Amino acid sequence: MVPEFKTVIDELYHQMESLSLKLLSACSSYLGKNEQWLGEMTEQGNTIMRIIHYPPLGEDTPEGAVRSAAHEDINFITLLVTATADGLEVMDHDGSWIKVEGDARYIIVDSGDMLQNLTNGLFKSTTHRVVNPSSKSERRFSMPMFVHPRNQIDLTPRPEFVSMTGGESKYQSITAGDYLHQRLVEIGLATSDD
């Protein structure tokens, strides 16, 4: 790795990690917990920052194809610096798609499935996708930070959140590590034997 690149990426990672703790602190307060509640769960967690390259499209790319189909992220929250090209869309409550306007001054934040599970749906996972550009020659780089809790964290919906969401647990009792593995198997990035 180019030393200058590593220095810049390390600094960006630490700044985004610091921001994630502030956001998780706000979420914790909103939930009526102490400010460190969610942040402490991510200490020594599986948080990862990826650089994703969406190459230019081939001439045979079918009409209506997307770069990344509709999905929700597995983790607690995702922080996303503005990508090099448009394409990100989020699903509204009515099922319609809203284009996310990129702006280098802002960080986009998505809530993920693990936070939804833990809060029994008080925090909903953000359904999103990446659509193809109008120009097939356009490439796109994206750099999400997926903020994960430690594997041992129990994601069973907490009783206080169950009572706030109708009194019935809507999500499974599972640890973060098992949840991550289950989802990686579902998307073909792990096997059930791992």
Q: What residue ranges belong to the model's regions?
A:
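C-terminal flanking tails of non-heme Fe-dependent oxygenases
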Residues: K6-D194
